[in-house]
Design a protein with these regions (language model features):
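C-terminal helical cap(s) of enzyme catalytic domains, especially alpha/beta-barrels
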Residues: 1, 111, 194-195, 204-210
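Conserved N-terminal beta1-alpha1 strand-loop-helix module at the mouth
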Residues: 1-73, 78-83, 141
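Conserved anion-binding
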Residues: 12-14, 81-174
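Structural preference for beta-strand elements that scaffold enzyme active sites
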Residues: 15-19, 41-45, 71-73, 95-96, ...
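Glycine-rich beta-to-alpha transition loops that act as phosphate-gripper elements at the mouths
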Residues: 22-26, 74-83, 125-130, 178-188
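Well-formed, non-transmembrane alpha-helical positions, independent of function
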Residues: 35, 61, 88, 138, ...
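Glycine-rich, proline-tolerant flexible connector loops at the mouths of alpha/beta enzymes
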Residues: 42-58, 150-157, 205-210
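Short secondary-structure boundary segments
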Residues: 48, 101, 126-127, 150-151, ...
Length: 210
């Protein structure tokens, strides 16, 4: 099971990335991927709905559809049994796996450790976390990526919920990690993420159809 260890593409701190989330069907994923330019700065995500529908095959299928060497994110949103989940995502071909910041600290610690073991990047998704710094302070090791995330339902049903752009500089001023921003549906929000020094901007269907 460890034959994947030497083949993984990893993120680099000096680069900025566009992260394209695919959440609908594999057919639609193929259509979107075919329109993307080949670039080491484009990350392609097997979204949570795809993984729930197709299992880990969603990851391997998206990897097959994308140009060789494309960085694939498995958005499994781990909340428990981190060792098992990371192994599954890595063996399916993912370059990164996600864990929720609201998960038990023990789970996040295990998740980060297992990602290191399988030579994939760890992404901790801070959706519904008031302060990412407070979570990071409790961890034994840092993840590769901290994701500030306003959820789809939050965006749709709450006009008051804002993406915490101010936390980007707080996190990067205290920790040597990459910061991703997810949940922006407009070009303006993507621009704000870049202006505030986000390393990764996550977009999904609503964004690139606008």
């Amino acid at each position: 099971i460890f034959n994947v260890l030497s083949k993984k593409v990893r993120l680099e701190k000096r680069k900025k990335y566009l992260h394209v989330a695919l959440n609908s069907t594999l057919e639609e994923a193929g259509e979107i991927i075919s329109q993307l330019p080949a670039s080491d700065r484009i990350l392609i995500e097997a979204g949570t709905p795809l993984i729930k529908i197709y299992g880990t095959e969603a990851i391997s299928r998206i990897k097959a559809l994308a140009p060789a060497g494309t960085y694939i994110v498995a958005d499994n949103k781990c909340t428990d049994l981190a060792a098992r989940e990371v192994e599954m995502m890595a063996n399916a071909g993912a370059n990164a796996s996600t864990c929720l910041g609201v998960a038990p600290i023990e789970t996040i610690d295990s998740f980060i450790e297992e990602c290191q073991k399988f030579n994939i990047d760890s992404m901790v998704d801070m959706m519904n976390v008031e302060s990412a710094l407070e979570v990071l302070k409790k961890l034994k090791k840092l993840p590769n990526v901290v994701m500030l995330h306003r959820g789809v339902d939050e965006t749709e049903f709450s006009t008051e919920k804002q993406i915490p752009f101010y936390q980007i500089k707080q996190i990067k001023g205290n920790y040597d990690v990459l910061v991703a921003v997810a949940g922006g549906d407009t070009i303006r929000e993507a621009q704000r993420a870049v202006f505030n020094d986000a390393d990764i901007v996550v977009v999904w269907k609503n964004f690139y159809q606008s």
